[in-house]
Amino acid sequence: MALDTPSSDLPVSTDDTAEHQPTPAHRPPSAADRRSVDLLEKIRRPRGFGAGAPKIAGTVVGVLAGIALLSSIFPLFRRLIHYPRDFIDNYIVSLPNTSLAWAFVLALVAIALSSRKRIAWWIATIYLVLFMVSNALLLVDPVATDFGVDTDERIQIWIGLGIDAAALIFLIVTYRQFYTRVRRGALFRALGVLIVGLTAATLVGWGLVWAWPGSLERTERLPYAFNRVVTFGSIDSRTFDGHHTHIVIDSALGLLGALALIAAATVLFRSQRLESLMTSDDEKLIRALITRFNDDDSLAYFSTRRDKAVVFSPDGRAAITYRVEIGVGLAGGDPIGDPESWPDAIAEFLTLCDRYGWHPAAMGSSARGAAAYDAAGFGSLSIGDEAILHTREYTISGPAMKAVRQAVTRTRRAGVTVRIRRHGEVPDDEMPQVIARADAWRDTDEERGFAMALSRLGDRADDDCLLVEAVEHAGTPEEKVIGMLSFVPWGRRGVSLDVMRRDRGSVNGVVETMVTELCRNSEQFGITEISLNFATFRAFFEQGPQIGAGPIMRLGYSVLMFGSRFFQMESLYKSNAKYLPDWQPRFLCFEDNRILPRVGLAAIVTEGFVQLPRFGRKQHYIAGQSSIPAGVDADALIAQLESEEDRTAVEVHRPEQVRVRVAKLDRLIEEGFDPYPPADAPTHTIAEAIAEPEGTQVTIAGRVTKMRDFGKVTFADVHDWSGQIQMLVEASRVIPGTPDFGSDVDLGDLVEARGVIGRSRSGELSVLIDAWRFNGKCLRPLPDKWSGLTDPEARVRQRYVDLAINPRSRELLATRSVVVKALRDFLADRGFMEVETPILQQIHGGANATPFQTHINAYNLDLYLRIAPELYLKRLCVGGVEKVFEIGRNFRNEGVDFSHNPEFTSLEAYAAHSDYLKMLDLTREMIQHAATAAHGEPVIIRVDDEGNEQRVDISGDWPVRTVHEVVSEGAGVEITSDTEVSELRGICDRLEIAYRPDWDAGQIVLELYEHLGEDRTTVPTFYTDFPTSTSPLTRAHRSKPGVAERWDLVAWGVELGTAYTELTDPVEQRKRLTAQSILAADGDPEAMELDEDFLTALEYAMPPTGGLGVGVDRVVMLITGQSIRESLAFPMVKPTDA
C-alpha cells in the first residue's frame, strides 16, 4: 500500500526555500540573473530604514477607509463609534459620519501607500499639512473667537496636532520607502471627468437637499451639497450653525461623490493601461523575434495579443509581454526572443515591477521558461498541462479512441464535411460572417483567455492563422457552417488552438471531426504538431478518482469538481484527454508564496473568469508609446534577425583550414573558374594510362593525395579507383588561362588533366600535363596520407574519407561486391530465380527476433521492417516457384557488436523436392565458390593475435556434428532429446551457464549449444538436428524424435547460416505459430506473430522443400577476415551527440 505524501499528491509546489520543479541544465548564474534575484528580494522584503512604513501607513489609512464605509452604510455602527469618530474627524483626519466618496478616496490612498506609491505619499503628506494648518488656525484669534473654541476644545486640538505631527514626521523620515511610480495616464482627461462628475453630482445633490432640506436654510443648501459631494464633509459643521439634512440624504450625497470619483479613476486607470500597451512597432519586433527564436514555443504567437504591454531586454533581442491586474504584473507564457537575452528581459520586467510597485508573476510558462524564471529567483507551481497532438501519430483506430471514432462516424453520416483554409484565403466579405458566428456561439459575454488566446479573430495581420470549419450540405443552397476552429501559427510546423466554437443545435461530434480532419490533412499545410486546450490541474482530475489516491489528492479533486460547476475545468480536461495527447506541463511562476492568492486572482481575472468593471473599454486596441529601448533601431534589428535566420539555415561552424579553402573557392569563382564543372569523361583510367607506352596522350581524372611544389614545376600524386600515378605540372607547358596548380590546388581536390605519358628526371612514370581543370574543390583537408584515419570510429563515421585515402578499404568494398555477385551467380547458374519480397510487413515473422516498427500515414497502419523474407518466399513456393532466392536487407532491433548490425544483408533460397542435407552441400559449395571468386582459390583470410593475415583452405567437405553430440562433449555427460529439464538445469548450474526458469528442455539445450558448441567452433562446421521446440518453422526429423531437420553453419564462433527441411504441414504449422503468438502476447518481443495469410497459403499445399538462409555480411567477414564494420560500407554507429 502506497503512503500518501505531499510529494505524491500534489502536482508541483514550491516555497521560497524549496527546490523548484523545473530543473534546467545547470549554468553559472549570469549578471542579469543575480540582478533579478536582488530585485525580487527587494520586492519581497524591502530593505532600509522604515522598510515597513508603507504597510503601516496603508493599514492605518485602510482602517479609516473601512470605518468610513461602515459608518456610511450602517447607522448602528455610526452610533456606536460616534464619539471616537467625531474626535478623529475634528482633530486628526476627516472622517465624516456618512461619505462613501471619502471612503473610496481613503481606500485608494491606502492601496497606493501599501504599494509604496510616491504620489500617495505626497497626497497624504500635503493633506496632513493642510489639515494641521486648518486646525492650528482655530487656536488663533479672531478665528478661535468666531468658532467659539473653548479651553477643552483647545486641548483636543493640541492632541490632534500632536498625532498629526507624529504621522507627518513618520512619513517624512520614511520618504525613501515610497519610491514606486504610477504609469503615465490621461491626467487632464480624468480631471475633466472628475470636475464634470462632481459638478453634476453637486447639482443633483442640491436638488435632493432642496427637496428634503431638514434644518438647512435656503442659502445653506448649495454649500451643504458641495461640502458633502466635493469636500467629503470636511468643512466644519459649525459653518452651517449645526444645520443639516436627513441622514439618508447625506448618504446619497456621499454616494454621488463616490460615483464621480469612480468614473474619474476608471478613466485614469484605463488611460494608464492604454498608454502602456504595445504599439505597432512593438508588435512588428515581437513578430520578428518569434519567427527567429520561438519555433518551439506553442504559445509564442499569443504574445502579439494587443491588450498586453511589453518590456524588452536592453538589446531588444528578448521581450516579456504582460498585463497588470490588481497590482500584479502578470507575464504570459515564456519570454520571447533569444534565450541568451531572457535573463536581461526578466531583469527589466522586475525593474518595471519594482518601479511601479507591482508583484511580478508569469502564467503558462513551459518548463524551459519556468527554469529561466527559477534562475531569477521565482517560485513555481504546476497549474496544468497543455494537450499536444502529433499529427503523424494521431489515429482514431483502437479501443482507446472509440469515443472519438464514433463521434466522427456520426458526424460524417449526418453529411458534415470539413473545410480548412488559411485566414488569408478567406474573402474579405466572408470574414465578418466568420466573426459573427464566433460571437454568436460564444457561451460567455466576454472572450476568455490570456496566455492561450489571441482575442482578435479576422485581423489581416494574422493571415497565416488556420481556419477549420464544419459544414453541413456543402456545395448546396442549404450549405451551413456549424462549427469552427481557429489556430495560430506555432513555428514552422505547428498550430495552436485559439478559437473553438460550434452551433449548439448541431450534431454531436463536430469538434472531434474537425480535429481529426485537420490531423488527416496536416501534411497539406505542413503541420506536424497541434496544441489544443490547456487542462488546469490535470493531475487531480486524472489521479483523484483513482483507487489509492491520497487524501490531499482526493480533497483537491473534490474542490476542483465543485469549481467545475462554474468554470468547466473537468469538461475541458476530458475534451482534451479523449484525443490521447502528449501532455506538456505549464507553470505559474511567482515571487513569494504569501502573494500566491493575489497572483491566482489576477490570473483568473486575466483569463476572463472574473469580470472587473470595464465601463465600455474596447476590446481591441493599440495605443501608447513604443517600449523598444532607446538606442535600439527596430528596423535594423529586424533586418539583422532575418539575416541571422537565413544564415542559420545554411551556415555551420567551420574550422580555420576549411575557411581558408572556402576563401580560395570564392576567389576562383570570382576569377571565372568553375570548381564544380559538368562532366567531361577522361580517355583513360589511371591503370589504363600506366599501361600505355610513353608518348601516348591521355586524359585522366582523380583525387590529389600528395603534392610537391618546386615553384616552376609541381609534382602531384593522383589516384582513381583503378590506381595511382604522378602528374608533372610545369607552368611553361600548361596552356594560358589555367589556374595556378601549385597555389590553387589543395590535397583532396578532384582534378582532370591532359598530357602525355613520360618520365620525370628521376625516372618515375608520370603524366606530363599541358592542360587541367578542377572536377571538384575539396573544402576539408584529408587526413595524413601515410597514417590515414587511425581512429577506427572515425573510419566508420567517415567511410567516404577512408575510401578516398585507404587502398585497403577500397579493396574490401570491391571484394564484397565480388562475393555478393558470386553468390547470386552461383544460385542463378543452378536454376534459382531471384525475386524481391516486401520489406514493410504487417506481421513480423520468419525468425525469432525483435522487429523495428514504423507507420504508414496513407493507411494509418503500423508496420514492421522485415526480420526475414521467409514467409513471403514460401508463398511463392506454394505458387509453384520451385527454386527461388532473394538477396536483400533485413532489420532486427537487437545489439550492435563485431558480428551484429541492426540492418544486414541476407540470402534466403528455397528448392522444391529438397531437404536440409541437400541444402548443406549447396551452401558449402556456394561459399567455396564465393571465396574462389574473391581470392582465386577456396581460401579465407584469418587475422592472428599479432595482426598477421593467414590464408586458410576451406576446400572439400566440412565437419558435420549433431547439436546433442557437441553439447554432450562439452558438458562431459551424455545429453539427448530425452534428457529431463531438471537434469539439464543441474548441468547449467554446474557449468555456470544462466537460464530462465520457464525454459523447456529444447531451449536449455540451445543455450548449452551456444556456449559449448558455437562459441568454441573454429573451422566451418555444420551443427544439425536442433530441438523441435526451438525450430517452429522446421519439419520434425524423419527418424529421430524430439529434434528437427535443421542445421546451423558456424565458423570461428560466428553463425553464418541455417537451413531447414521446411515444415509443410499446415495443421502442425498453425499449432506452432499459435504457440509463438501466445508468447508474443505474453510480452516476448522476439516471438513471431500469427500470420493468418501465410497459414492460408500453406493450406493450398506446398511441396517438400529445403530452405537455407545465409548472412551475406558474415560470409564477407569470413572471406576477408574483417569484422562486420569493415565488411559494410556504412554500418550503424551511435550518433556523436548520443
From Swiss-Prot:
Residues engaged in binding Mg(2+) 1: 1048, 1055
Transmembrane segments: 56-76, 92-112, 119-139, 155-175, 190-210, 247-267
PROSITE patterns, A to Z: AA_TRNA_LIGASE_II (PS50862)
Record InterPro entries: Aa-tRNA-synt_II (IPR004364), aa-tRNA-synth_II (IPR006195), aa-tRNA-synth_II/BPL/LPL (IPR045864), LPG_synthase_C (IPR024320), Lys-tRNA-ligase_II (IPR002313), Lys-tRNA-ligase_II_N (IPR044136), Lys-tRNA-synth_II_C (IPR018149), NA-bd_OB-fold (IPR012340)
Renumbered residue ranges of the record's region Phosphatidylglycerol lysyltransferase: 1-646
BP GO annotations: lipid metabolic process; lysyl-tRNA aminoacylation; response to antibiotic
Topology of this chain in the membrane: Multi-pass membrane protein
An annotated GO cellular component: plasma membrane
Chain positions recorded as Mg(2+) 2 binding sites: 1055
Feature: compositional bias, Polar residues: 1-15
SUPFAM superfamilies for this protein: Class II aaRS and biotin synthetases, Nucleic acid-binding proteins
Top-level taxon: Bacteria
Coiled coil: none
Residue ranges, annotated region (Lysine--tRNA ligase): 647-1138
EC number per UniProt: 6.1.1.6, 2.3.2.3
Subcellular location(s) of the protein: Cell membrane
DNA-binding positions: 698-772
Catalytic activity: tRNA(Lys) + L-lysine + ATP = L-lysyl-tRNA(Lys) + AMP + diphosphate; L-lysyl-tRNA(Lys) + a 1,2-diacyl-sn-glycero-3-phospho-(1'-sn-glycerol) = a 1,2-diacyl-sn-glycero-3-phospho-1'-(3'-O-L-lysyl)-sn-glycerol + tRNA(Lys)
Record key words, sorted: Aminoacyl-tRNA synthetase, Antibiotic resistance, ATP-binding, Cell membrane, DNA-binding, Ligase, Lipid metabolism, Magnesium, Membrane, Metal-binding, Multifunctional enzyme, Nucleotide-binding, Transferase, Transmembrane, Transmembrane helix, Virulence
Region entry Disordered, spans: 1-34
Task performed by this protein: Catalyzes the production of L-lysyl-tRNA(Lys)transfer and the transfer of a lysyl group from L-lysyl-tRNA(Lys) to membrane-bound phosphatidylglycerol (PG), which produces lysylphosphatidylglycerol (LPG), one of the components of the bacterial membrane with a positive net charge. LPG synthesis contributes to the resistance to cationic antimicrobial peptides (CAMPs) and likely protects M.tuberculosis against the CAMPs produced by competiting microorganisms (bacteriocins).
NCBIfam families: lysS_bact, PRK00484.1, PRK02983.1
Protein name: Lysylphosphatidylglycerol biosynthesis bifunctional protein LysX
Organism expressing this protein natively: Gordonia bronchialis (strain ATCC 25592 / DSM 43247 / BCRC 13721 / JCM 3198 / KCTC 3076 / NBRC 16047 / NCTC 10667) (Rhodococcus bronchialis)
